[in-house]
């Protein structure tokens, strides 16, 4: 019995570690009765405290192993329930209108960072591709042999703080932080910020 109890404890610890950056929004406060609710393009992310300095790139928390990328051959594919599938090169992505924000990057129990991430809104690409009626969610996957994917609702993907970062703190993304492109989802925990982004699928 002691052996089974020990195995149960180890399993529980493993689950906690795996779900440390689980799928829950940072802000947990409910909207008071009668208060206006945010629109589809307004985020409920926790704002950056005014006195908190930017986290240096070398101090940013990170997980995962960088993926080797042939930047000349790289294409960010956007397909699924769209009228015009896209295959966008890295250089083309750099020419898209970009936003620059300082969202809260949190992996509960491990790190909370504030850095300035810059890149085009996901909404811009979705509008270019033409989202079809009936689409409900958007999946983001890296380019690994066994791709790591996270899914946002379509409304979350259209938020003003959901974008594709190619720059952090004024510098090109380092490989360990998602070069060439990393999803920034300001209303979500760090597990949703997919690094080494290769594929966006509208479902």
Segments (PLM) and residue ranges:
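Bacterial N-terminal signal peptides that target proteins for export
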Residues: 1-8
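C-terminal motif of bacterial Sec signal peptides marking the signal peptidase cleavage site
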Residues: 17-20
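Bacterial lipoprotein signal-peptidase II cleavage site
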Residues: 22-30
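Structured, non-membrane catalytic/scaffold regions adjacent to prosthetic-group chemistry
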Residues: 26, 34, 38-203
